[in-house]
Amino acid sequence: MPKGVQAIVDFGKYELSIIQNEMSYGGTQGLYEIAVSDGDDQVELPGITETGDTVKGWLTSDDVDAILIKIHTITGTEGKQI
C-alpha cells in the first residue's frame, strides 16, 4: 500500500473505502478517492459513483462527508470505521 491515509467505513451491506496517497485520484493535490464494495467486489452505487465506474476521485473532505451521509441514507445503517 502506498504511503498515505486510508479509512474503511462499514455500512452493513456496503463498505466505503476512502484513500489519499500519491497513487489515488487527486491524492497529490490533497484530495480523496472513494470506492464502494459489497463483500469482496467493488460496485457501482447510484448517487455515489457514476454508471460504469466503481471509483470516484478528486474529492474534497466535504465531498466525502456528503457521500458518507448519502450511504447512511441509502442503507439506513450508521457507518462504523473498521
Describe the residue ranges of each PLM region:
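Catalytic phosphate/metal-binding cores of nucleic-acid and nucleotide-processing enzymes, i.e., regions
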Residues: 1-82
